[in-house]
Amino acid sequence: MTEYKLVVVGAGGVGKSALTIQLIQNHFVDEYDPTIEDSYRKQVVIDGETCLLDILDTAGQEEYSAMRDQYMRTGEGFLCVFAINNTKSFEDIHHYREQIKRVKDSEDVPMVLVGNKCDLPSRTVDTKQAQELARSYGIPFIETSAKTRQRVEDAFYTLVREIRQYRLKKISKEEKTPGCVKIKKCVIM
């Protein structure tokens, strides 16, 4: 069974935990309890393939920012979440993306931009703005509601598909590189 390491990032209070718990446990948590770091595992079938999702739900609060590098190193794909009623959380996405690229030392990291809380009438981030940002990053954009479960699965499953494409690209690039021999080094003590 293929395992996918997904990391949910974004500012505090945007609904990262609510999205994750909605996917894992099928219920909405409406009380806000700031996360330090929680890990969840769920077996799902995506496009006919049985997968194990290893989801890391992270702290949005600045006081935990020192922990970010560590979980960004281990993650394969990132859900970059903002709240559609919080412009600052949308502006913060740029910082998360830059940090991910720096830690992964790559321009090409599987990501999905997620605009959460689309059930709320008090929108401050226009859908077009978010679509344009996602297009400029070359990543998908999905609006979700953790409360109503709208497109929650879609967000996570789209990220898995992005990781699959990334893995395939990486394999074909390695096969096309002429004269490259993988050398594995072992140290026996």
Swiss-Prot record:
Superkingdom of the organism of origin: Eukaryota
Classification via Pfam families: Ras
Lipid addition sites, N6-palmitoyl lysine: 182, 184-185
Enzyme class at the top of the EC tree: hydrolase
Propeptide, residue positions: 187-189
Subcellular location: Cell membrane; Endomembrane system; Cytoplasm
Known role: Ras proteins bind GDP/GTP and possess intrinsic GTPase activity. Plays an important role in the regulation of cell proliferation. Plays a role in promoting oncogenic events by inducing transcriptional silencing of tumor suppressor genes (TSGs) in colorectal cancer (CRC) cells in a ZNF304-dependent manner.
Name by which UniProt lists this protein: GTPase KRas
Gene designation: Kras
